[in-house]
């Protein structure tokens, strides 16, 4: 282990419109090449489309619910024992849960064919809110993989 002190976590300020730290982290994940104003524009217009489509009064609550539906509870980690590598199911930490859900939503929005990012992101958020779509499938696959390797759960760290 390193003898240096542990790195301090950067405190992220809340976003200016909704006052949410979670939304600001989401904007930071959407951002590419340091262009935050473009990322903000994309996320805010996607949230507007999302709220109109689902008919929610509180956009932030609907966004958090969509994010909650995408969060994985379990994942598998490789663990080498003897000469064999086992896929050991472990519980996902709270911070990593958020991070994975955001990453999956954004990647699936980017991979939507022939759509601009705003439309793709809004569509993916709607799908997550309704518990369907590629992000939810990814979450279910992760859970299925953990369930299939439940026999190796005793190899925990």
Swiss-Prot record:
GO terms of molecular function: rRNA binding; structural constituent of ribosome; tRNA binding
NCBIfam families noted in UniProt: rpsG_bact
Gene Ontology biological-process entries: translation
InterPro entries assigned: Ribosomal_uS7, Ribosomal_uS7_bac/org-type, Ribosomal_uS7_CS, Ribosomal_uS7_dom, Ribosomal_uS7_dom_sf
Protein's UniProt name: Small ribosomal subunit protein uS7
HAMAP family, per the entry: Ribosomal_uS7_B
Species for this entry: Chlamydia caviae (strain ATCC VR-813 / DSM 19441 / 03DC25 / GPIC) (Chlamydophila caviae)
Similarity remark: Belongs to the universal ribosomal protein uS7 family.
Quaternary structure annotation from Swiss-Prot or TrEMBL: Part of the 30S ribosomal subunit. Contacts proteins S9 and S11.
Function per UniProt: One of the primary rRNA binding proteins, it binds directly to 16S rRNA where it nucleates assembly of the head domain of the 30S subunit. Is located at the subunit interface close to the decoding center, probably blocks exit of the E-site tRNA.
Keywords of this entry: Ribonucleoprotein, Ribosomal protein, RNA-binding, rRNA-binding, tRNA-binding
Entry-linked CDD domains: uS7_Bacteria
Gene3D superfamilies named among the record's database cross-references: Ribosomal protein S7 domain
Example of a GO cellular component annotation carried by this entry: small ribosomal subunit
């Amino acid at each position: 282990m390193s003898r240096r002190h542990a790195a301090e976590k950067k405190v992220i300020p809340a976003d200016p419109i909704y006052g949410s730290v979670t939304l600001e982290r989401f904007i930071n994940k959407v951002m590419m090449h340091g262009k935050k104003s473009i990322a903000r524009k994309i996320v805010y217009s996607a949230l507007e489309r999302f709220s109109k489509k689902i008919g929610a009064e509180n956009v932030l609550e609907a966004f958090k619910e969509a994010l909650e539906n995408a969060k994985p509870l379990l994942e598998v980690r490789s663990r080498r024992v003897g000469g064999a590598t086992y896929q050991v199911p472990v519980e996902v930490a709270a911070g990593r849960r958020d991070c994975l859900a955001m990453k999956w939503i954004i990647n699936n929005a980017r991979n939507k064919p022939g759509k601009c990012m705003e439309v793709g992101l809004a569509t993916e958020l709607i799908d997550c809110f309704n518990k369907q779509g590629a992000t939810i499938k990814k979450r279910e696959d992760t859970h299925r993989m953990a369930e299939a390797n439940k026999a190796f759960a005793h190899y925990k760290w």
